[in-house]
Amino acid sequence: MAGKSPEEEHPVKTYGLAAHDSSGVLSPFKFSRRATLEDDVRFKVLYCGICHTDLHFAKNEWGISTYPLVPGHEIVGEVTEVGGKVTKVKVGDKVGVGCLVGPCRTCDNCRADLDNYCPKMVLTYASPNVDGTITYGGYSNEMVCNEHFIVRFPENLPLDGGAPLLCAGITVYSPMKYYGFAKPGSHIAVNGLGGLGHVAVKFAKAMGAKVTVISTSEGKKDDALNRLGADAFLLSSNPEALQAATGTFDGILNTISAKHAIIPLLGLLKSHGKLVLLGAPPEPLDLHSAPLLMGRKMVAGSSIGGLKETQEMLDFAGKHNITADIELISADNINTALERLAKGDVRYRFVLDVAKTLKAP
């Protein structure tokens, strides 16, 4: 017997914003999602954060995009329907979906709650799904996914400011917990004060760490110290300041995705210090062994987090009232926002107001 067609697999008509080629320009787009399965949650999308990854995918800058492409993996909304076996949430609950909608849940990583390192992971958009179709993201009026990949939003956490935590928040929270350097009595640095960096400062301070922001821009100093509550600011273009900070930090979260030198950062670490890379510059790193040998230092990496840890992160954010600093934008202004994002003209995250501004084509 022949399998179901894509139209039969995905009978629910919906709409969103899609890129159709590597220009990255988004336009209204009609498509379909699957019917609600017994372990699925369907929800109305209220807000969706705009991540720099969305821009990379829309423009096919990593060479793996498939079109049409509906971006968005910082998705929050209100549950409208649940399958008969769903126990995690109910209709009316506020929920979120981050970067993943389909790890295998059987491999060693999945069994260890490391869904984010599953070799068979299904991304929230532009990824082959188990039914052979391509996933579409949260720049759309509704979502449906297995309840395993749903996280619950704390009641006190604003949905718009909380949306970017589903990518930016877990991206900085996970390495702080795993590498153990954000805790009372520790001194960490956040290199780069953008979408990731500003959230990293908030989480690290809430964990009790002393925090220094490192930036190439003197203009970020006031925000770092007075808006975000960092303890110190280090201008990385000032050799004297860097020399004075030698051996200062237990750990450095390196949030920068552009090409930059990392060897000077290693000199800022204490012995046994850890430099954790969160950005992915397109060029290889220039790294020598000597700075690592002298002090038993480590260069490591981290990518988002598993579903269990993402829920833990949201609960922590709710307890400490942590949200991203956002600029809310309408669907009509999505391409302008992406252009500004490419230029770094955002303080600090764009969030798409889906429910109020996204109209059916």
Swiss-Prot record:
Keyword entries, A-Z: Metal-binding, NAD, Oxidoreductase, Zinc
Positions bound to Zn(2+) 2: C104, C107, C110, C118
Gene Ontology biological process: alkaloid metabolic process
MF terms (GO), sorted A to Z: oxidoreductase activity, acting on the CH-OH group of donors, NAD or NADP as acceptor; zinc ion binding
InterPro entries attached to this UniProt entry: ADH-like_C, ADH-like_N, ADH_Zn_CS, CAD-like, GroES-like_sf, NAD(P)-bd_dom_sf, PKS_ER
Sites where the protein binds an alcohol: T53, H73
Cofactor(s) the protein requires to work: Zn(2+)
EC annotation from Swiss-Prot or TrEMBL: 1.3.1.-
Subunit annotation: Homodimer.
Domain of life according to the entry: Eukaryota
CDD domains per record: CAD1 (cd05283)
Chain sites annotated for binding Zn(2+) 1: C51, T53, H73, C167
Cofactor binding, per record: Binds 2 Zn(2+) ions per subunit.
Recorded family membership: Belongs to the zinc-containing alcohol dehydrogenase family. Class-III subfamily.
Record-linked SUPFAM superfamilies: GroES-like, NAD(P)-binding Rossmann-fold domains
Pfam families, per the entry: ADH_N (PF08240), ADH_zinc_N (PF00107)
Organism: Catharanthus roseus (Madagascar periwinkle)
Protein's name according to its UniProt entry: Alcohol dehydrogenase 9
Name of the gene: ADH9
Amino-acid positions noted as binding NAD(+) in the UniProt annotation, renumbered to this chain: T53, G192, L193, G194, G195, L196, G197, K221, L278, G279, A280, K356
